[in-house]
């Protein structure tokens, strides 16, 4: 297995002080995942990632983000300018070996494909849910795992803001609660809310903003890290439900994750890289695979890290990853998911346009130096 030299940054002193007491998840970069794609396919920016009950890994990517020199074969030019490349279909499904087993997506009959592919989730019925963050994206889509269209909620271009219960507003991501068969949406790039619908009928159930407040679309103004915490979401970018019934929401530009009960009652919050500007630090997260789901793995798209957070205490305990385009490094991580074995999958945006697997190696005490992936204790 290829090893990766990682330079330990300024938290090394903290590492030395806590190394004897802190046990954190340790990961190793897996250079074998995924296998090469067929037909000279190229992938664009990664919108979202998910894992199903079979531990198959789903990726939704943006073919439209490929540049001209990355799509010569599919450009329609005669003769073709080069052998590479053809944009891959938006939805890709891989088995645990990294082999592509299904690919589908794009415009079709009976539904409106998103302008900008973003969120993906596979529920307890093996239904694949999709969300888009383009300017006109105000809807959700449901498909079978092999790409047969099932249902659409909302209509493109029809968003009525955060009070609208018939449309979304550039939704970022979603999750389905199997206990109640409800879909929870981080409705996010246009609106500023969590909205909950019946997963079959799309009947409206409830919605809330930051701290459980009524959603408010009043422009919040530029982010100021020295100001009191914003009382509304700036951009709820990711959402997940823990096994013990708590709802976690990543509010990206506010650099925080907030915790709620399923009825929208506010519980707690954690700020990570609180002074981050740009697009914000709290790009998304996944829950660890152990029965207690002890950890949150939060991707930080601005600082190019994965932060490890104790879920119940919300204490930031470690991180891995640093900026770079080499295997095992990170460049604008935008999506994250975890399989049943605890392996972490990270999808990247902008120039990286890739997804990587980090193998879970158990709990341990990380050490500074040259190891496959350095987990740095905070």
Per-range role (PLM):
Residues 2-14:
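Bacterial N-terminal signal peptides
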Residues 17-378:
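Eukaryotic scaffold repeat domains enriched in small/polar residues
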């Amino acid at each position: 297995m290829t090893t990766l030299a990682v330079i330990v940054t300024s938290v090394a002193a903290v590492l030395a002080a806590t190394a004897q007491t802190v046990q954190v998840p340790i990961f190793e970069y897996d250079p074998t995942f995924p296998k090469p794609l067929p037909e000279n396919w190229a992938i664009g920016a990664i919108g979202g990632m998910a894992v199903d009950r079979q531990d198959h890994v789903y990726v939704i990517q943006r073919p439209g983000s490929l540049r001209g020199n990355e799509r010569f074969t599919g450009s329609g030019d005669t003769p073709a300018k080069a052998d590479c490349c053809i944009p891959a279909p938006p939805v890709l499904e891989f088995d645990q070996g990294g082999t592509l087993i299904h690919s589908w997506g794009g415009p079709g009959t009976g539904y409106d494909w998103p302008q900008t592919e973003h969120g993906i989730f596979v529920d307890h019925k093996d239904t694949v849910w999709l969300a888009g963050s383009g300017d006109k994206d105000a809807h959700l889509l449901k498909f079978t795992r092999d790409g047969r269209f099932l249902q659409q909620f909302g209509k493109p271009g029809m968003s009525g803001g955060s009070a609208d219960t018939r449309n979304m507003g550039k939704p970022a991501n979603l999750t389905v609660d199997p206990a109640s068969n409800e879909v929870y949406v981080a409705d996010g790039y246009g609106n500023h809310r969590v909205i909950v619908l019946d997963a079959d009928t799309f009947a409206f159930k409830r919605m809330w903003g930051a701290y459980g407040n009524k959603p408010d679309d009043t422009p919040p103004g530029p982010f100021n890290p020295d100001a009191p915490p914003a009382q509304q979401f700036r951009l709820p970018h990711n959402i997940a439900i823990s096994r013990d019934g708590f709802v976690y929401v990543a509010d990206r530009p506010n650099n925080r994750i907030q915790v709620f009960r399923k009825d929208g009652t506010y519980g707690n919050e954690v700020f990570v890289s609180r002074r981050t500007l740009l697009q914000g630090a709290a790009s998304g997260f996944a829950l660890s695979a152990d029965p207690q789901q002890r950890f949150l793995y939060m991707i930080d798209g601005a600082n190019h890290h994965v932060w490890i957070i104790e879920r119940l205490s919300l204490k930031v305990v470690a991180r891995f990853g640093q900026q770079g385009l080499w295997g095992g490094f990170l460049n604008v991580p935008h999506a994250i998911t975890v399989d049943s074995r605890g392996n972490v999958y990270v999808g990247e945006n902008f120039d990286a346009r890739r997804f990587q697997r980090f193998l879970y190696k158990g709990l341990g005490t990380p050490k500074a130096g040259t190891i496959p992936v350095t987990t740095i204790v905070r």
